[in-house]
């Protein structure tokens, strides 16, 4: 996809790149040539799944400094794909509900798009698959995704240390766990430093 981006557009992980990736996944799912590409939830459906019907959603983007990037990568034990962090805040009737981040990662050879829902206390509440462009046998089940949720040490989100494997899906497990750790570490570093 990067070959189709205009010069000057930040690649891999920038808010525009993530949006374009999500739209590309939607188009790929609509193509008769891409029978295995599957969009599971549109963005508005995902936000409703995260915060419930009637929530007000606002988008925020933070620039990540080189010092913050180093701290996030050390905490997450993975590399960041962007120097920007885009997240959404959900509110209903003035009450803060939490955060959501839409991320995309290459699993084996194709893109998966997922959303990480985080409480106001920075605990992962849900991980929701939005699009999965690999064969269905590599797609994690909802019960597997629940391993990524809850208040647990970051090392428990590392494959082989706290996550059960998915037979034949090591790259899927690695991609999703890397993404969730990066989101969680980004919140811990960026929001605790001064929201």
Place the predicted regions along the sequence by residue.
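…; additionally, a secondary subgroup of soluble metalloenzymes is captured
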Residues: 2, 34-35
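Flexible, solvent-exposed loop/hinge segments and secondary-structure transition points
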Residues: 35-174, 178-195
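N-terminal secretory signal peptides that target proteins for export/translocation
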Residues: 1-15
């Amino acid at each position: 996809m990067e070959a189709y981006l205009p010069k000057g557009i930040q690649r891999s992980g920038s808010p525009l790149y993530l949006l374009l990736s999500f739209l590309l996944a939607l188009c790929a799912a609509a193509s008769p040539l891409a029978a295995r590409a599957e969009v599971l939830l549109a963005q508005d459906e995902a936000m409703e799944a995260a915060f419930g019907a009637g929530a007000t959603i606002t988008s925020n983007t933070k620039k990540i400094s080189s010092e913050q990037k180093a701290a996030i990568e050390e905490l997450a034990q993975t590399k960041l794909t962007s120097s920007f962090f885009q997240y959404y805040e959900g509110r209903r009737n003035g009450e803060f509900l939490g955060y959501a981040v839409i991320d995309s990662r290459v699993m084996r050879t194709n893109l998966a798009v997922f959303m990480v829902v985080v409480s106001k206390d920075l605990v992962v509440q849900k991980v929701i698959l939005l699009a999965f462009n690999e064969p269905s046998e590599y797609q994690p089940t909802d019960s597997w995704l629940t391993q990524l949720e809850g208040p647990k040490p970051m090392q428990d989100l590392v494959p082989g240390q706290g996550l059960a494997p998915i037979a034949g899906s090591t790259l899927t497990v690695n991609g999703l766990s890397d993404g969730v750790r990066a989101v969680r570490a980004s919140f811990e570093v960026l929001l605790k430093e001064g929201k």
